[in-house]
């Protein structure tokens, strides 16, 4: 895989306050410079773009440390062609669209806490934590969460990345969650990306997934960074073009 050179941290982003630093397992960080008003989101190619990440422990660096989570990896060393970024990582360990995480939260809480009118992009990733929930209850919850994100940030682009698989033959319930998330993402006007169909983690499970069979290794987090960053930048460019 070809890697694009990356800027130094000090020339691109800086850490800003976390949504709740007191949460031990929250994995909730915001990184980037202060952003200008959202009144002119495409006014300048140098305008800071605010990205909100909604997700679970696959986005927090669980098992390796927050610094290794793919959102922090992008923020710490963005590609040379990336605009100035403020990445607000609201992901919570154990959370899902319907599943309540270790801090008592779901994706709905993350949207409420992190998505503001200033957001340029809201990225959803997951969630494998929803596999045991009844699809009949899960699907309307997914739809409501996307609607809430739209309401809180009408100008933002929505990018939805479905749950990954850890086998070339994923179980039926995983595919069912993927399918309903895709349906609701497209209904909400979001772009949907399918890690199962693209084989994100099954490319090399021994390298990318830790001994628990679920969470990324350090190398796996870098692999997710390499998958997510082009999607993020493409979505930001598309949003800027539409706004312009």
Where are these regions (language model features)?
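Oxyanion-hole/transition-state-stabilizing segment in secreted/luminal serine hydrolases
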Residues: 104-139
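Acidic/histidine-rich helix-loop elements
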Residues: 63, 88-106, 213
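Structural recognition of the beta-strand scaffold that forms the well-ordered cores
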Residues: 50-55, 59, 86-91, 120-126, ...
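Conserved catalytic region of serine esterases and O-acyltransferases that act on ester linkages
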Residues: 2-14, 29-31, 226-244
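C-terminal motif of bacterial Sec signal peptides marking the signal peptidase cleavage site
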Residues: 24-27
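Serine-esterase "nucleophile elbow" of acetyl-processing enzymes
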Residues: 29-93, 112-113
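Catalytic His-Asp segment of secreted/periplasmic serine-dependent ester chemistry enzymes
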Residues: 167-244
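Active-site segments of SGNH/GDSL-like serine hydrolases
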Residues: 125-129, 148-179
